[in-house]
Amino acid sequence: MSGGNDSVLHRPVEAPLMEDGELSAVFTIRNSSGIHVRPAGTIVKLFEGEECEATLTYLGKTVNARSVMSILMLGASYNGEVAVHIKGPSASRVMQKLSEVFNSGFGEL
């Protein structure tokens, strides 16, 4: 293990895929405590005022990315990969924000 300093932090899925305002990407969880309440709240807050639908998928389970409780139910842990799918006019802006928070380890690195 490299202690969370991996050179590949954000791996787009097929580009990122852009079709009618749709984007998909895969992010690696870099903070050692995984996605707990604070990171889940950070993710949900990114969607405030944005026009898009979004899901997170971890270990085959897909949830609404606008719900803290749903995100917590994923149990996403350190070094896990979370697939993000966003659809809507704000998809590009929100994906950029998500990339920043995942790559910063939700401010816990």
From Swiss-Prot:
Q: Name one GO cellular component term.
A: cytoplasm
Record's keyword terms, sorted: Cytoplasm, Phosphotransferase system, Sugar transport, Transport
Q: Which residues form the HPr domain?
A: 22-109
- Superkingdom assignment: Bacteria
Subcellular location field: Cytoplasm
Keyword Transport: yes or no?
yes
| Active site as annotated | 36
Q: Name one GO biological process term.
A: phosphoenolpyruvate-dependent sugar phosphotransferase system
Question: Is NAD tagged as a keyword?
Answer: no
Pfam families given in the database record: PTS-HPr (PF00381)
Q: Which InterPro entries match?
A: HPr, HPr-like, HPr-like_sf, PTS_HPr_Ser_P_site
Q: NCBIfam families, from UniProt?
A: PTS_HPr_family (TIGR01003)
Explain the purpose of this protein: General (non sugar-specific) component of the phosphoenolpyruvate-dependent sugar phosphotransferase system (sugar PTS). This major carbohydrate active-transport system catalyzes the phosphorylation of incoming sugar substrates concomitantly with their translocation across the cell membrane. The phosphoryl group from phosphoenolpyruvate (PEP) is transferred to the phosphoryl carrier protein HPr by enzyme I. Phospho-HPr then transfers it to the PTS EIIA domain.
Please give the family membership noted in the entry. Belongs to the HPr family.
Entry protein name = Phosphocarrier protein HPr
Q: Which organism was this protein described from?
A: Chlamydia trachomatis serovar D (strain ATCC VR-885 / DSM 19411 / UW-3/Cx)
Starting at the broadest rank, the lineage of the source organism is: Bacteria, Pseudomonadati, Chlamydiota, Chlamydiia, Chlamydiales
